[in-house]
Amino acid sequence: MKVHRRNKLADVFFRASKDALDNITSAFDFVHPLNVSLRYTRSVIAEALADNPDLTTADFQRMIDPNNIVHGVNYNRAFIDTAWISQEESLAWLLLNNLFAIHEGWAQRLFEDIFSGFHYTDRFIKNLEFPGLTNKFLSYYVTNGKKSVALDGAFWGVYKAKSHLDFSKLENYMLCYRYFKEARNCYMHHNFVASQKLIDAYNDYIPVATTTDLDVSEVPEIAPPVLGQPVQLRLRDVIGFSQLVRRIIIISDINLLCTTAAEKEFFDRTPSNWTCRTLSGNPSRAKGQINRYSEKLDFLNLNGRRIIRICSLITVFSLYS
């Protein structure tokens, strides 16, 4: 399984995106050790029972938690009566619910901290949760009146190249997102039972549920849902899905940096103790000034001709370095 790493802020433009990616990493820092601990405890109890079938919950407690630190653990029910496949599925639901909480919190934070002050409505949040997102970047988020020519020209290509992602697959990722989101809704609101919305999302997702269309080595999926029957979930598939959530956040972040609202993010990160200087009229020196500004604030470096695109924006606000 892929190891999640902490993200440098320069990997994405917005602080909210960086924090969301780090929160996904933190979720795995909890789930993976918990997975190992559960498997280990089961193996210890299974070996002990093989030697003595008459052991009780009290005996297991003395083996696993001799200092009785955790109260109320029913070892028989948790590690004998409950099959591992059921316990692992509970982990999968826990992780899935966390992934959507992270994504929804990311969208909410972007809206409240940055975009709500630039004539966006609550649609800003909802659009980030549904297929059709690629078109929404053109028709809603980055329209002519909301586009920053300076940030688009200076940063979009740099961040896109650094991401190594295929932006044309975003719609496929969103179909997968909606499929797992409806599964999560069944978990939260329908007692794990499959809804018609889940079946519809499944039918929309299946045509693109291939390694090629998702650019993955293994397709995240759920057993075909049956209306009114419990939804079956595997931890391995949720782990795979988490990679697509990361891609959705990164691709969305890079598209949203092209907005005039993103200029607020760009300048809000200026330290209060920096000295204000006028941008040099010498192109070479101006490039160095802007690159230092970008580095200090943990944005990706600009290169070559792109430096000219942001000069007018920097000049308006002066330059902090």
Identify the residue ranges that each predicted region occupies.
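Histidine-centered, metal-coordinating catalytic motifs and their short helical/loop contexts
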Residues: 172-209
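Short flexible/disordered coil segments
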Residues: 138-143, 180-195, 254-271
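Short non-catalytic regulatory patches outside canonical folded cores
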Residues: 108-174, 189
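Short, glycine/acidic-rich beta->alpha junctions
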Residues: 87, 91-94, 168-171, 179
